[in-house]
Each structure stands twice: as C-alpha cells, then as structure tokens.
Amino acid sequence: MTRPLRFAVTPFLTVDGPDEWRDQLRRIEDSGVSTIVLADHFTEQWSIEPLTGLAAAAMCTRRVRLLTGVLANDYRHPVLTHRSAALVDVLSGGRLTLGMGAGWLRTDYDAAGLALDPPGTRLERLREAVLVIKALFGDEPVDFAGRFYTINGLVGRPSPVQRPHPPIFIGGGGPRALHLAGSLADIVGVNASLRAGALGPDAVYDLLAPRVLEKVGWVHQGAEAAGRSRDDYELEMNLWLVRVTNSQRDADDYLARIAARYEISPESLAESPSVLVGTVGACADTLLARRDTYGITQWQLDAGLSVPDPTMVAQLVERVERVERA
C-alpha cells in the first residue's frame, strides 16, 4: 500500500501572547502541512508544554493533526498522559497523534532532578506506559500489574473521538527502541541514536543512508515478531537540514560547505534521509524517491529548530501533491 507523503512543522518554541500563537498556527495550517508538532523538553530553547500547547492549538485550527513529538515518558505518569491526551483528542475533534518516547535529553533530567536510568529500563517503562494508555482509551475498567506501573480498576475518561485510540507514535534510534516501536506503534519515528543523552555530531553519521536502511530493518523486525504487517504502521523521519535553493549549483555549493565540517563527501550528505537540499522540484522528487527506498511517508521539516518559511513549505507541499496526482 502506497501512502501519500505528509509533512509536519513546529511553531515557535516560545509564546509571547495568544495573538502571536494563534497567528503562527494559522499560518502553518494555511501552508498545507498535515501536522503541527510540539516537543517535550524543559531546557535548551523549549518553553511550551506539548499537551497544553496542542489543546490551545485545537481551538484555533480546523484541519491539521496535532502531534506530541514526542512525550518523554519519564516526565508523567501514564494515567495523567492518557487523561490529557484524551482531552486534546476531544477538543480537536479527533486530530491528536500521541507521540511517546523513552526520554533521552540529559540536561532535562539533570535540571529536573530526575534519574536518567539505563536505556533498557527506560524502554521497558515506556512499553508498560503505552500498554496502560492504550487500555485506558477503551471503555472497560483497566487493571494492570507491571514492573513500573500498577492500575486498579480505572476507567479512562474522557473517551477519545478516534477509535480504538488516537494513533500512537513512538520514536527511537537504536535497535531496542525501534524493535519496540515496530511492535506497538501506529507511526514509527526513525531517529539518530540518543544513548549519549545529547544530540551531537555523531548523529550526522548515524543518519547516513546505509545506517537508516538498517534502522528501518529493525522496525520491520519488531513488527514481524509481534505478528504485524507493514500496512499496520507508517514510518516518519525528521529532516535536520532543509534548504530550498534557486538552482542545483547553489545546492551543491551549500552541501559541499556543510559536508566539509563533518569530513564526509557531499554525495553522502545529500543522500542522508535527514537532509533535504535543492530546488523545490528536486526536493519533491527526492522525498518521493525516499518513500520508495525507505518506506518513509511522514517528514518533519524543521527538526533543526528553525521555523520554515511558509511560502517554501507551501511550494514543496504543492509540488509533491502535483507529482502524486500525475
């Protein structure tokens, strides 16, 4: 089954007032993207709590989906995550995608006084949390006894609009995380490995084309082990470097400069699925080709923390849609 390409962007990382927030969200929606995404961090440049922000977004948008990208599971008990997520789904008329991850950013954990447990522990806790949340989206009382969470006869309220539950998005970069995502998620975010607790230059090498093919394979292995088919889930990826140029020569010059910083070839950088540089037409063709190669159908355009030009986004979305209709 061939799915259409879809695009997500992040609004500003800070909010100065309701008018600015509302106007930014409406500009994003008008650009033609399919999803607004809010990340979940305490430190660096982040100041917007994602579920609260998406609840506000639900009230001033009509069409776009709303993605938590992604909630760090350690920051909230799954009962609270479920309740807030269910309310966002209701307020939005069924537009929530609930993104969850094991947590990774060491500065967040240190600043909040939280223990950054080993990856295996965090992943097992995430697995339990997702099972609890999925159960709470149902209509029956939930009983759950796990290593990390115990639920006793709790009925999840409010009931979500989307049934059996809003789509579950799980992101990860290593084999264990991507196996887990393949076994449980409706959408799998293929990312760099974040074992170090920070996003550094190593992420560039971890997202080169051969490595991403390996990561996609881990997702499929996890899904197959759980008895799932490839039609049961989608793949998503963040674009960490996006630049739309006026000519291919401008694109080549830009790629050469960036590649030199990391001592890799411009060709290797250009082929990385996390990099999109070229004219609007070339970028559209590249993304469509990557769907064929990797199976990736959802792309976040601004993972590098720069709010994209709405005109550029609209041109890219329109070009992709035109090619898909042809």
Model-found features: residue ranges?
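Active-site-adjacent structural elements that line small-molecule/cofactor binding pockets in enzymes
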Residues: 1-326
